[in-house]
Amino acid sequence: LHMPGHKGVPFLGCENRDITEICGADELYEAEGIIAASEKNASELFGFGKTIYGTEGSSQCIRTMLFLALQARENRTERPVILAARNAHKAFLYSCALLDVDVEWLLPEGAKSLCACPITAEQVAEGLKKSSAFAVYITAPDYLGYSPDIKEIAAACRAAGVPLLVDNAHGAYLKFLHPSKHPLDLGAAM
């Protein structure tokens, strides 16, 4: 059953163009037509191997990112632990609960705001020395527009042999700055 959210009641004037996943309109989960072409265009635009649109927004993308990192970890005998900046979105916490992952928080000194979490590469490196984390998770840019030094944090993660996972939900534009500030261009794994 497919139904547009406006339920056929016109209020913006564009509802007759609002179609959903019906024959000939392509489907997000099985893209073959215009959506597949758009994903291909996005891959070329961003310069990445493959783009797949999420169907449930950033929350689903966070779950997917954590699941992929969890599957790639080498030590599967220990309970999985991830090192994370404390300003992570609640979808990250829900994903950790769903995947049975423990969180060890990066708590920067002097940060008084719940939204601000100005972590440094040094803090990440120190945290990784004390942790058996399979990955590091940060939000960049955060809810206040701040972005830590991803290039240096990614280097610290690589030195420790763990991937850097970045929630970049508020930073799609970063690819188009010169030079690019996109987390993947700066060394993040996902």
What function would you assign to each model-found segment?
Residues 14-60:
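Conserved N-terminal alpha-helix of the aminotransferase class I/II PLP-enzyme fold
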Residues 7-11, 30-33, 91-95, 121:
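Short, functional N-terminal and low-complexity linear motifs
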Residues 3-5, 21-24, 30-31, 146-148, ...:
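Generic structural "secondary-structure junction" signal
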Residues 41, 45, 51, 57-190:
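Conserved PLP-enzyme active-site core in the AAT-like
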Residues 1-17:
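N-terminal glycine-rich, Lys/His-bearing helix-loop that initiates the first secondary-structure elements
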